[in-house]
Each structure stands twice: as C-alpha cells, then as structure tokens.
Regions:
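Juxtamembrane intracellular "pre-TM" segments in multi-pass secondary transporters
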Residues: 12-29, 211-239
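Pair of pore-lining "gating" transmembrane helices in MFS-fold secondary transporters
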Residues: 25-58, 230-251
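C-terminal membrane-cytosol helix-exit motif in multi-pass small-molecule transporters
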Residues: 176-177, 196-216
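Cytoplasmic helix-loop-helix junction between adjacent transmembrane helices
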Residues: 127-163
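Helix-to-loop junctions at the C-terminal end of transmembrane segments
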Residues: 81-93, 180, 283-296
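Short amphipathic helix-loop junctions that connect adjacent transmembrane helices
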Residues: 52-64, 253-272
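C-terminal ends and interior cores of transmembrane alpha-helices
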Residues: 103-118, 306-310
C-alpha cells in the first residue's frame, strides 16, 4: 500500500550524520495519515470564515463599509501569528504548535457564535483573528509531512496532505450549508459551534502525531533573514505571493456577499466558494511537474494571469 511505502527507509541509517536520525521516520505512515486528515478538518476553518464572515459582518457592522473588516482581521491574524507559530514549533516541537493552533480554532468558533447571539461586531472581529492564528498553523502541515518521511517519499507525502486540502474545500461549504439554520434566529451561530467541534476533532487527530522535538544542532546555523531577504529570487517570490494572495482575498471576500446581494441563495454562495477552494488545491498534484518542465517563473506568471482573468 502507498502508506506502507511512506514508512520504508529510503537510505541506510548508517549513512546519516545524527544518532537520532534512524528514529526520524519511525512514525511516517501514521504522521502523514494524521496530517492529511487534519488538513481536511482544519483547512475547513478558513473556508467557513470566507463563506460567512462578510455576510455576518454586513449584518452586525455599525457601518456597511466595515462588512469585510472581519476577513481583513482574519488575514492579519494569519500573518501576525505565522512567526510566533514557527517559534513555538522550533522550541517546543511541531505537535505543540499544532495543538495551540487547534485551540485557537475552538476559540474562533465559540467566540463567533457568541458574537452572533449577542450581535457584537467587534467580538466577531476578535474571533476572526483567532481564526487567522489557526490558519497560520494549518499552513505548516504540508511541510511537517515532508519532513517526517524519507527524501524520496516527500512528493507523495505532500500529495496526500494537499488532497486533504481538496476535502477541506468540500467540508467547509457543506458544513455551512448543513448548520447555518440550526439555531434560529441566530443565522450561522450553529455553523460556528460546529466549526469549534471540528477544530477539537482535529486536535484529537493531531495529538497522535509523533514528530521529534528539534535539538540545538537543528536550530543552529542558517543564514540571517537579512541576507535571504536581499536576494532577487526571494524578492520575486514574495512579490508574487503578495499580489496573488491580495487578489485571491479580494475575490473570496467579496464573492459570497455579492452573490447574496444579487439574490442568490446562501447554498449557491457556499457552492461557488467550494469550487474555488477545490481549484486552489487540486492543481497541486501536477504543479510540480509543470515547474520542472517550464520553470517556476513561467508557472508563477501563468498563475497570476489566471487570477487576473478571473
């Protein structure tokens, strides 16, 4: 089975430099399976936020111009918590960072539900910040999967976790559709409570991940960030990331609210976002081959062109 392949050592442990290296891949199969499931569950967090936050913001905001502020705060939370999440993983291990992130996932669901019940716009904004912190941790799942398997198994491990992202694109919108009317008249309150439950389930899955805590030797060395940031390739990559993420957020933020204001149902808005997220993750299965054949610059340019056309 494919899962068994992930657990097989790709190289003789005697060729490795560190004594702990033979144990590095001992739980490869279990780790990749858990990270894939967690990606599907935790990845639904961002989808729920994008599907509902602008609509809830429009209903709760003191001024309709602030309707999309909760999603902006979600993005700020993701950016602000990326480095702290990395620091926690570096000093205390990735599983600790994962559980801290899923803890934020539970909080966003509980606080958002309370905000809807109380009609508090600013509490809802605070909730989406925790959602951003949760999303920052979820972004690291794929890298953790790559690090916990032998080098020649990494593409397959990444494919598994990215497949979890495709499932997240289905779970998130369907979660909204199935739960948005569970607590009338508090529209979406049931959705946020369900989101908290899904985050707790993800925490239970991630609690079984067995990744080694980094040693001092692992944390030592490396180039200063200032040296890296001055490289043209780094600047190009960051610029492409900023532009593409800005445009993607613009589309994902406005689309659900615009669809509702055009008279379409919430179910239709959820379905539109579902296909958007599936299209985000599904190409990951063959993007690597395209980069190998055409080069990263051409593939990045094609991606920006597609975003512009959309």
């Amino acid at each position: 089975p494919i899962e068994d392949d992930l657990a097989k050592p790709a190289i003789d442990s005697s060729t490795l430099n560190t004594p702990s290296s033979p144990d590095l891949y001992a739980h490869a199969r279990s780790n990749v399976a858990r990270l894939t499931i967690a990606q599907a569950l935790s990845g639904a967090n961002a989808v729920v936020v994008y599907a509902t936050a602008a609509i809830v913001g429009n209903a709760l905001a003191p001024n309709h111009a602030l309707a999309t502020l909760p999603i902006s705060i979600f993005v700020v939370g993701m950016a602000a918590c990326s480095l702290p999440a990395g620091a926690i993983a570096q000093h205390y291990g990735r599983r600790t960072a994962f559980l801290a992130g899923t803890g934020c996932g539970v909080l966003v669901g509980l606080f958002a539900a309370l905000a809807v019940v109380l009609g508090s716009f600013w509490l809802f904004c605070a909730a989406t910040f925790f959602g951003g912190a949760y999303a920052a941790v979820v972004l690291s799942f794929r890298f953790s999967a790559a690090d916990c398997v032998p080098p020649d198994r990494r593409p397959r491990a990444l494919s598994f976790v990215m497949a979890g992202g495709v499932f997240a694109g289905v779970i998130g919108p369907q979660l909204v559709t199935l739960t948005m009317n569970l607590w009338p008249p508090h529209f979406f309150a049931g959705t946020y409570l369900a989101q908290a439950a899904v985050a707790a389930l993800s925490a239970a899955v991630l609690s079984g991940v067995r990744l080694p805590v980094p040693t001092r030797e692992d944390m030592a060395g490396g180039r200063p960030i200032g040296v890296i940031a001055r490289q043209p390739k780094f600047i190009t990559a960051v610029t492409c990331g900023v532009v593409s993420y800005l445009l993607m957020n613009f589309l994902m933020t406005a689309a659900p609210l615009a669809m509702r204001m055009c008279g379409l149902s919430q179910e239709s808005a959820n379905l539109g976002l579902q296909w958007h997220v599936i299209a985000m993750y599904a190409p990951s299965f063959f993007t690597g081959r395209l980069i190998t054949r055409f080069g990263a610059h051409r593939v990045a340019a094609a991606g920006l062109a597609l975003t512009g056309l959309s």
